[in-house]
Amino acid sequence: MNKKGFTLIEIIVVIALLGAIMLLVVPNITKNFKESKKRLFYDNVLGIYSSASRTYFSQDNASNKSFSNTGVKLDVDISDDITYRVKVDSYGVVLSIYVTDGTYTYKLDNANGISKKDIKLANVIEGKVDDYLTLYEQLFKDNPTISTRTDFSTPFTTNTVNTLYKATENGTDVYYFAGQDTASTPINNWVKFGGFYWRIIRTNADGSIRLLYHGTSTTATDAYIGKSAFNASKDSPKYVGYMYGDTDATLEEARTNTKDSTIKAYIDNWYANNMTSYTKYLSTTAVYCNDREVGSGTYSTTTPFYYAAYTRLDTNKTPTYDCTNNNDKFTVDASAGNGKLTYPIALMTADEIAYAGGVNSTNAPMWYYTNSSFESSTGTTYWWSLSPYFWHGDNARSWDVNGSDNPDNPGSLDYSLVNYSDGVRPAVSLKSCTLYSTGNGTASSPYEVQMDGGC
């Protein structure tokens, strides 16, 4: 029997049939693969959502309310290629969630809270969709190294490039910049906001970011809004107060906060003329601590005593961000403090200066002292802190910072009579919802925030 091979026509028919089968099968395989990958991504989104509340309440004092793969991380097992950002409220309710793996993206915001049933597979977007970071989140992205300090007895001159230092404020984790700004080790805490330059001091317990005024230029040598006495009089211990009472027989009477200090009135007037257009971006719950607790001795109008900041910073070298007495917690919002601030603005504290690297009566040209040219930001002018120092012989004194005319101890903590005219460098706090716009925090490219979104 003769063997017969396939004819050309038969081969063509077979190829056509195979092609038709492939046209039917391959798209389904591809579709199933994409759907499986999309489902896997969606499962990651659900895992991230479910872990947010659990992680929030597992923290000591449920402190952090913002989580991301580059900042404070969630306790969740997810794919390595996932980028996420989640925000919760004080009850652990998710307010916003952003997840992407570069191929798929899920993004949802709801100020009233997001439930699990709101997380729908149908809302997964193919492709990567950019998400705006808050300035708070950008800080962690640009400063991935988180460290802690325990020794505050000497000026802090360690290289701190791209580093944030962790401490606590009333049990909540907060992060601060520390160290000396140099050409080779610049500290990236510059911000341009409201038409002025500022330096980031730290984050606050409410998630806002505290800024120190630096004027209209990064090279300013007059980075203060003017000069003022802390109070016009110095002959009562009550005059260390940012506000004070009508009488001073007891510490409680001295800090009833019925009258504005000279410096508060000065700062409020400057704010009214320069910053009211930007109030919506500033925290009303950030606490500015005018700590009038007694540290050594007993409160008296006739005998000497030292305030608590003296004991902490001069004797024990142990600064704190805590503020123990509600009358000393200056805030706009009474739910977070005394509610006595007219505007969301005050001064940097001596404890914040110590965390930043400063020490009493010791050469300390730290970032808060220098401009971008590494000269004194205030020239020869000393400038006020918010912290009381001591009372002695009809003389009330508060902490301040040396200018360049003290060649032995430039930038160090010092003290002045409260009726002395020092430079005034206000501090404000950008809300946690303030969106990052541009910049990397350097003097040549300061952080800027979006003026049309976030808050």
Residue spans for each PLM region:
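Short, well-structured alpha-helical interface segments that form or flank functional binding sites
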Residues: K3, D43, G47, G195, ...
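Intrinsically disordered, low-complexity regions of secreted protein precursors
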Residues: K116-K120
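Sec-dependent signal peptide cleavage junction
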Residues: V25-K37, G441-T442, C455
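Long, domain-scale functional regions
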Residues: S63-S96, T100-G102, L108-D109, A122-C455
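Flexible, surface-exposed loop regions and adjacent strand-edge segments
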Residues: N112-G113
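Membrane-proximal N-terminal amphipathic helix
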Residues: K34-A62
